[in-house]
Design a protein with these regions (language model features):
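Elongated, mostly alpha-helical coiled-coil "stalk/stator" tethers of large membrane protein machines
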Residues: 1-94
Length: 94
């Protein structure tokens, strides 16, 4: 079985995004269920989702979040950030 949040977390870690930008994205995606719902809702047009991403998130995360949105995976953002934290801890201990 594929661990989707972990896979996204690994990609995010490899992107080496500025911690402040990650914090912004984490806050938006974990504290706004309405935002997550809009980004996973199949009734919201893809172009609208992309506009939302470009208006709210740091540019360094646009493509990553667009892929998550296109795949309907934004709903796993909280688990992804938890997995990301685990990767960071693991790398710091090696």
């Amino acid at each position: 079985m594929i661990d989707l949040p972990l896979n996204y977390a690994r990609v995010l870690y490899d992107m080496n995004i500025d911690p402040e930008n990650l914090s912004t994205a984490r806050s938006l995606l974990t504290e706004s269920p309405e935002l997550v719902e809009a980004l996973v809702n199949p009734l919201v047009r893809r172009s609208e989702k992309r506009n939302i991403i470009e208006k709210l998130f740091p540019e360094s995360l646009w493509n990553f979040l667009k892929v998550m949105s296109d795949n309907g995976d934004v709903g796993c953002a909280s688990e992804m950030f938890d997995a990301y934290d685990g990767i960071v801890r693991e790398k710091e201990n090696t």
